[in-house]
Amino acid sequence: MRRILVTGAAGFVGGHVLPRLAAAGDRVAGIGRGGAPRLPEGVAYETIDLLDEAALSAFVARFRPTEILHLAGLASVADSASGPGQTWRVNVNGLMNLVAAVEAVPGCTFFFVSSGEVYGSAFLAGHALTEDSEPLPRNTYARSKWVGEQLLRDLLPRIGVKLVVLRPFNHIGPGQDERFVVASFAGQIARIEAGLVPPCLEVGNLSSYRDFLDVADVAQAYAGLIGRAESLPDGRVFNISSGMPRTIASALDGLRDRARVPFEIRIAPERVRPAEIPLAAGDAGRLRAATGWRPLVAWEDSLTRVLDDARARLAASRETGRGADPRS
């Protein structure tokens, strides 16, 4: 039986991957900064900050994982730009603390969730990139992930821990907060429908092409790779992507078609990223060859799920009197 530790278990992706890992019959434990999320039966959870080295080391030594899925970290490009110091502290110092803790469990496999963002300027080639493309990160978040990859390649072999690098591209789904573009559109639409704000949706650059996946497909990719940990080569990198880029405008159009009321669109200068990459897409052929994975959730269903979730969360927040927190 595997003993799988998931960091960042209370976050967006954690809520989708924990049930898949638990369903395989393995022992699963999660850690995160927040309180315990709704957990599948049999999954343990403990509130631990990655920057608390002592607590982290004690938990790893006690649980003794055979696989680690490292989801935890700051994931917003915009937040990283406005607060680079905190990004480096969490994404690199926190990672260093986890590596120190993992010294207690030689022989385990460390699945590091990096990001398709690390390719950066390489996307200017204008086509879907394979894992052989040279990363040329362009922002603080991407640089922190690329440094994390290099750090692990240096440190894990010294302690007998296998490394597998995961580079997911944009993913959407229930539970994502509004720092991310599709969730932001959905949250704004839900508030417009409820009459809480004027019927005007604020957007940034709509012409960029991005490689979107449903979070359920990303979670399945993670679970499939973890289930084959023994056969994966040390240091292997896997893109997790559809290979079918779509414009951000097409996501907005799809949500607009599902909206219950009409609304206008306004370009908000503060939402426009400087020097935006026109097209970012990944080739996941290596992942398909290794596990047979392919995306199963239709794009239209993903958009419906995102908007329904935004409506449900808004309704729940109004019932409890909290108002609508776009970052929840």
Regions found by a protein language model. Give the residues of each.
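Catalytic helix-loop patch of NAD(P)-dependent Rossmann-fold dehydrogenases
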Residues: 82-97, 118-165, 170
